[in-house]
């Protein structure tokens, strides 16, 4: 498999979809996991892929992130091809942020150090300014000096979100980020995150098996089953 040439991704243009998935098929191990799936996400949209475990939704997310090769089809970000059979742009060059159920914070680093851990190319002054801005945005400034073990589950997930947003990605990918939280906290945090993403026009894809999460956060919802996209529409259509 060849690596695609280096590309520069400017901020998303309003004239092209931020993400375009065209007829992709993928395997999970030796088994086919995704069949001929197509969808488009515009700049500033929050969309969800909803379906049971094993339906292929996480495989789609991994393909968008650059961790999953394609058997067929094409993925484009901001009008530029990033994946097709035999060619894949590496994840770190895609301007994509990721938040997973296992937020995997560095236990020996403070909140602000965790958030700044992916900003090594910035100067110290620029890094501090960026971290402060992101922590303010997600409501974590007052715990900036604390360590992960001193935080609640909801706070830890906010740190993971802040860390994903710090490099200013074009697209935020979230894989079941709230499923380990209790119901009340999951609903509250999900709504807070949805409000923050909308207020800042951040384009995102949420993968979930929970219909409540999908309807709380999705401008559009894609329903998946057995590797196929069965429905793709606005949340209440």
Question: What residue spans do the PLM features occupy?
Answer:
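Conserved ABC ATPase "signature" region
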Residues: 80-83, 125-143, 195-201
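Conserved ABC ATPase signature
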Residues: 147-151, 155-157
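ABC ATPase "signature
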Residues: 229-233
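Catalytic Walker B motif of ABC-type/P-loop ATPase nucleotide-binding domains
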Residues: 172-176
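A short, proline-enriched helix->beta-strand linker immediately N-terminal to the Walker B motif
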Residues: 166-170
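ABC ATPase NBD coupling module
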Residues: 82-97, 121-129
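Short coil-to-helix segment of the ABC ATPase nucleotide-binding domain corresponding to the Q-loop/switch region
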Residues: 109-118
């Amino acid at each position: 498999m060849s690596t695609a040439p280096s590309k520069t991704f400017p901020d998303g243009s309003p004239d092209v979809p931020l993400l375009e998935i065209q007829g992709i098929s993928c395997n999970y191990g030796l088994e086919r996991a995704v069949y001929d799936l197509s969808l488009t996400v515009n700049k500033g949209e929050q969309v969800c892929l909803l379906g049971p475990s094993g339906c292929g939704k996480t495989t789609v997310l991994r393909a968008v992130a650059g961790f999953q090769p394609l058997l067929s089809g094409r993925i484009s970000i901001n009008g530029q091809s990033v994946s097709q059979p035999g060619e894949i742009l590496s994840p770190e060059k895609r301007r994509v942020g990721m938040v997973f159920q296992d937020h995997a914070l560095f236990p020996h680093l403070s909140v602000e150090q965790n958030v700044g851990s992916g900003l090594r190319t910035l100067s110290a002054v620029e890094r501090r300014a960026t971290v402060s801005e992101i922590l303010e945005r997600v409501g974590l400034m007052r715990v900036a000096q604390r360590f992960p073990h001193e935080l609640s589950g909801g706070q830890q997930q906010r740190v993971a979100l802040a860390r994903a947003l710090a490099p200013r990605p074009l697209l935020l990918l979230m894989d079941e980020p709230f499923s380990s939280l209790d119901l009340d906290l999951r609903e509250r945090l999900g709504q807070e995150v949805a409000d923050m993403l909308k207020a800042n026009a951040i384009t995102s894809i949420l993968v979930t098996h929970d219909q409540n999460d999908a309807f709380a956060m999705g401008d559009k919802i894609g329903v998946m089953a057995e590797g196929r996209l069965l429905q793709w529409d606005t949340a209440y259509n």
